[in-house]
């Protein structure tokens, strides 16, 4: 369908999703770059009675609960601890004159109904 900015805001994602549902009756999925926007998309889909695959990023508590309840398809959790650890490792190596890799991979965690309980507090 396309890409539109919702400026990281739940209400803008909701109105964008409402517009898309109206324009594209065959819409199947909405992928959001944060969970606030995924929750806005979810609110729009539920208000319209539309069953969509909706995925967000961040693993915020209400999104995780929506995943557990079967309302949100998934959330992708960035590993902030892993990112911080990699930065510290690189800084230490640079500080002592060691060579560092040009790229580090810190895996993301896909949170679905199968593993959401591991992330809920």
Where do the protein language model's features map onto the residues?
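A residue-level marker of the well-folded mature domains of exported/periplasmic proteins
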Residues: 1-121
């Amino acid at each position: 369908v396309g890409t539109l900015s919702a400026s990281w805001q739940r209400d803008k994602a909701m109105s964008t999703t409402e517009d898309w549902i109206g324009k594209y009756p065959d819409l199947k999925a909405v992928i959001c770059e944060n969970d606030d926007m995924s929750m806005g998309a979810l609110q729009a889909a539920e208000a319209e009675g539309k069953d969509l695959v909706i995925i967000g990023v961040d693993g915020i508590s209400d999104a995780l609960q929506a995943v557990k309840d079967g309302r949100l398809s998934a959330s992708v959790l960035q590993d902030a601890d892993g990112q911080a650890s990699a930065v510290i490792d690189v800084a230490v190596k640079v500080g002592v004159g060691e060579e560092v890799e040009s790229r580090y991979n810190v895996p993301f965690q896909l949170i679905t109904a199968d593993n959401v309980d591991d992330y809920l507090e």
